[in-house]
Amino acid sequence: MEDYKKRIKNKLNVVPMEPGCYLMKDRNDQVIYVGKAKKLRNRLRSYFTGAHDAKTTRLVGEIRRFEFIVTSSETESLLLELNLIKQYQPRYNILLKDDKSYPFIKITKEKYPRLLVTRTVKQGTGKYFGPYPNAYSAQETKKLLDRIYPYRKCDKMPDKLCLYYHIGQCLGPCVYDVDLSKYAQMTKEITDFLNGEDKTILKSLEERMLTASESLDFERAKEYRDLIQHIQNLTNKQKIMSSDKTIRDVFGYSVDKGWMCIQVFFIRQGNMIKRDTTMIPLQQTEEEEFYTFIGQFYSLNQHILPKEVHVPRNLDKEMIQSVVDTKIVQPARGPKKDMVDLAAHNAKVSLNNKFELISRDESRTIKAIEELGTQMGIQTPIRIEAFDNSNIQGVDPVSAMVTFVDGKPDKKNYRKYKIKTVKGPDDYKSMREVVRRRYSRVLNEGLPLPDLIIVDGGKGHMNGVIDVLQNELGLDIPVAGLQKNDKHQTSELLYGASAEIVPLKKNSQAFYLLHRIQDEVHRFAITFHRQTRQKTGLKSILDDIDGIGSKRKTLLLRSFGSIKKMKEATLEDFKNIGIPENVAKNLHEQLHK
């Protein structure tokens, strides 16, 4: 047993059966996951025993040690978990990777405030209103307010009057001493409007329209009329879900097949203006998962706390209140409960859709390999291994192999090869070498053999591979070749002793699968070749610099990875990784010659 596994096993025996938080660390001592538990020992043992889903399996495979912190209660564990996630931002805590950022309208906290549309919420810098369903909706609302209120527009106060002053859309605080009470009144009216109180602004515009009409200024009266209609259109676009205009978020969730879907409805001005959907693989009870989610939703993501948060009645209200500093409502009946139920129903529908898509995807890939086997006259190729070479005029030649199982990439079984015995650009011999090395090892280690081998190339490549398999290794595995057209796209599948074209329709699932395989093996091979060339070029440059031996060369490669990064580095950067000052100066000079 490897040392780290022994250490983990021994440490598990001393973990207490108490509530607390735990931190999983990788080989670099980086925190990769933070979790909480009612009983730490049971939760931590569960990671290292039994079967897991793919995500948890990947996580466990990277764990080299763990730490834990005992707390006095489950509530304290939840609060500590949120703080630890904020501190370390572990990559396996998926909620931190929320890339959904919604637009808000912001009134800045300045002497003469401005109106902005932003996706970034920074507490203490102003008032935020939203979220809006999309940027267009937020921009249209801002444009409307810009036309009605002569609010400051410039980012920095200029030293002279700008265009907005001359067209009546700014009071010119950059030059004139604008009455702050007048500005405060505008801010109040804008705030009321953005909070859903449009009666005040409509009444004001109607009065201005009548005044303009009585003064025979019909052009100005028409402008006010258009603004009134625009406001009415803007506020009536969405179905009214409630006459109560309290700003609230409504949460509902559903659980199935080890997954949890949480739906959030953003209710603003009586309208549902946005919906947020999050899928989470269950790693604790559904209630615990929800408490973690809602705490992160408001503390770690770009979401403004509403006046009310509505949640299902089966949850612990006090637990939620400990991490969400606003009014928590658990409606028992009526329209508000209907909204929570609707959010839960939508979550269930989203989960069902997810599983249906997975099922369809599996059906398509199985159909593709069955069709491929039928057209080639072989058994269904459950396991396919494909090879491609990459080099430039025989320099740094490499090869790569990708594996597809049940029509899907099996990336843990991808392999890279540096060509060892072939001199110069000889694609056929390179392919023979790699196939020989691959399947010699497969036989020696008792690894699974593929049902089909695909090479990127034609008859010459196929014959070379078949010769190695049959005459050197005694294997009888079907070998096919994939050819590309003049646009470098997958064109034909070749198979058989005379490398005949297999009749596949270009719109068939089988052909689509072959296209994916060829693209993937080419991508994998060429990426490896670029990495190899980069390292070779880097080594050759470093070889000519005094004071840089093999150990320092390795250190530089690990620390910077490329010449470009080294050229961007300072003397201090080199010294910080352990390069002596005189060598660092020499290195810096040579790189900038």
Swiss-Prot record:
GO biological process: one example: SOS response
Keyword Transit peptide on entry: no
Gene Ontology terms: cellular component: cytoplasm; excinuclease repair complex
Domain of life: Bacteria
Keywords: Cytoplasm, DNA damage, DNA excision, DNA repair, Excision nuclease, SOS response
Residue ranges of the TM segments: none
InterPro entries: GIY-YIG_endonuc, GIY-YIG_endonuc_sf, GIY-YIG_UvrC_Cho, RuvA_2-like, UVR_dom, UVR_dom_sf, UvrABC_protein_C, UvrC
UniProt-recorded Gene Ontology molecular function terms: DNA binding; excinuclease ABC activity
Primary localisation category: cytoplasm
Domain GIY-YIG intervals: 17-94
Subcellular localization, as worded in the UniProt entry: Cytoplasm
SMART domains linked to this entry: GIYc
CDD domains hit by this protein: GIY-YIG_UvrC_Cho (cd10434)
Function: The UvrABC repair system catalyzes the recognition and processing of DNA lesions. UvrC both incises the 5' and 3' sides of the lesion. The N-terminal half is responsible for the 3' incision and the C-terminal half is responsible for the 5' incision.
NCBIfam families per record: uvrC (TIGR00194)
Subunit structure: Interacts with UvrB in an incision complex.
The protein's name: UvrABC system protein C
Gene that this polypeptide is encoded by: uvrC
